[in-house]
From Swiss-Prot:
Keywords: Allosteric enzyme, Cytoplasm, Hydrolase, Metal-binding, Protease, Sodium, Threonine protease. The active site is at 12. The keyword rRNA-binding does not apply. GO terms for biological process: proteolysis involved in protein catabolic process. This is ATP-dependent protease subunit HslV. NCBIfam families: ATP_dep_HslV (TIGR03692), PRK05456.1 (NF003964). The keyword Transmembrane does not apply.
Length: 185
């Protein structure tokens, strides 16, 4: 899925898989400008610990915009420790109402090991119906592969790695250099 909302810059696949009491978030390392790979080892999945409560976040879109959103999410989490959904809804409200934030071009997947949410560029907070979600240029490929692999007995991390490998084989804006973070509640 090409992201027309982010013209010029392409190249992110972030996938989250929840299974067996843990959530695994995986992201590829490729950043492209047009038809050129600018970097192959970008780290788009981060572990945050605001107020001592661990959260894992993966981002797609503009890196600077994503970092701005991550910083604001950390502040919301400090104000509502251990309440990921509440912090994300508060961030989404700001995102929709603030003139500056409305122009940010990024999406986030966030989890505390129990709650799994997607924050869209439109300021929406979505909880996936299934225990899998994905964003970015290869997100649909990774999502389809992971949903198929959920029918197996594979653990979450293996599902994430296999699905990301499939996405990297299909999407030219996704590579196999993965950052993988696991978190459980």
């Amino acid at each position: 899925m090409a992201e027309d909302r982010f013209p010029g810059w392409h190249g992110t696949t972030i996938l989250a898989v929840r299974r067996g009491g843990e959530v695994v978030v995986a992201g590829d390392g490729q950043v492209s400008l047009g038809q050129t790979v600018i970097k192959g080892t970008a780290r788009k999945v981060r572990r945050l610990s605001p107020g001592g409560h661990e959260v894992v976040a993966g981002f797609a879109g503009s890196t600077a915009d994503a970092f701005t959103l991550l910083e604001r999410l950390e502040k919301k989490l400090e104000a509502a420790p251990g309440q990921l959904a509440r912090a994300c809804v508060q961030l989404a409200k700001d995102w929709r109402m603030d003139k500056y934030l409305r122009n940010l071009e990024a999406m986030l997947i966030v989890t505390d090991g129990e709650t799994l949410l997607v924050l869209t560029g439109a300021g929406d907070v979505l909880e996936p119906e299934h225990d899998v979600t994905a964003i970015g240029s290869g997100g649909n490929f990774a999502l389809a592969a992971a949903r198929g692999l959920m029918a197996t007995d594979l653990p979450a991390e293996e599902i994430a790695r296999k699905a990301m490998a499939i996405a990297a084989d299909i999407c030219v804006y996704t590579n196999g250099n993965l950052t993988v973070e696991r978190i459980s509640k």
